[in-house]
Swiss-Prot record:
Manganese or magnesium. Binds 1 divalent metal ion per monomer in the absence of substrate. May bind a second metal ion after substrate binding. GO terms for molecular function: manganese ion binding; RNA binding; RNA-DNA hybrid ribonuclease activity. InterPro entries: RNase_H2_suA, RNase_HII/HIII, RNase_HII/HIII_dom, RNase_HII_arc, RNase_HII_hlx-loop-hlx_cap_dom, RNaseH-like_sf, RNaseH_sf. Pfam families: RNase_HII. CDD domains: RNase_HII_archaea_like. It is found in: Cytoplasm. This is Ribonuclease HII. The lineage of its organism: Archaea, Methanobacteriati, Methanobacteriota, Stenosarchaea group, Methanomicrobia.
Amino acid sequence: MICGVDEAGKGSVLGPMVIAGVGVGSTEMIDGFGLRDSKQLSPSERERLFVLIKKKCKVATVVISAAEIDAFRREMTLNTCVARAHAVVIAQLAPEIAYVDACDVNPFRYAETVRGYLSSPCEIVSEHHADSTYPVVSAASIVAKVTRDREIAKLAKKYGQIGSGYPSDPETIAYLNAYIDEHRIPPPIARKSWKTVSTLLAKKTQSSLTSFF
């Protein structure tokens, strides 16, 4: 079996990161799916393909919460955290070859990092933009994206309009600003180790000091 591995939400300031692996006996199994990188697909296309992939392929996912990411980052880099999670889904699928989207400027080094977390032999093919090159990684990208979108939807029901969770999203930043204004601390779903959060907190502290004096 071969598998593809990708993640969604790596750079998000709110909510979890999702790592997904998709295993197939051969690439012919998914040749007719019309797979592409999840970012090139509409939400409805992703949902349709998600159902098809889950039905026809072996799938493994790992969901890492914001609090867990903060805890990991006290001990390792984010890239190492992703590599560990990639290894977890690879171990669950137990393929002979795993294609991974490299989370390192050096894809060969990233392959070695992932391999170091595996206890069973597996050939790791690590490349940048693997989600655009290998359909099996595109499939993993779709599973990761849809799974994360569903997790964000659950959080929005509980916490209100949080946007996509990414620092580039004005709705996400507006939510963070409003929450910190009211509670003086970041929300539980925020990655407190992110510079976005520390910068907003620093601005609020500076603003409070200025008004005091």
